[in-house]
Amino acid sequence: NWIVKDGYFFCLQHLGFASVYLEAKPMYADDLWWDIFNLSENKKCPTSLRGIGAFSIHAAQLKEYAFLNECAEENNEEELSKKWQNIFCLAVQDIENFLRNHPNADTFIPNKNCNYDADKLLYFITLLHNGRKNEVVQAIKELKAKGHSCQFCDWASGMDSYDFILKWCKG
């Protein structure tokens, strides 16, 4: 379940039944991400895949909603429908609050100390979009010096996401 609003991609994600997460990212994030990897053809993908596809950038986690304490099969259809309606109502309110605090997707920069993106890729993409290339290069060099590498790695070239970002920054 996702929506594009005011330059942001918002999505409700769940990997199990205990929690549902409201996530957001600027719509430009995946476009820039794919430019860095020379994968411009991905820009033609459906919006749903652009937002949460296998090679899209992680969104910022805005909110966690408790969903089910037990297995979904133990709830009837009416109970599940009510629970989802409640989540949707809460998410709409939280999206509106987020947009009041961050009305311009072009200037949004997520918390760099988040726990949902160990590689800080959305953070770096938003900095790059805002012309803060030197800050990104310095931060990535510091992370690499500490031995941190990204989850995504191109085995053929031996490069990880940080290497691709550094290469793109050199231009």
Which residues does each PLM region occupy?
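Intrinsically disordered, low-complexity regulatory regions enriched in serine/threonine/proline
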Residues: 4-171
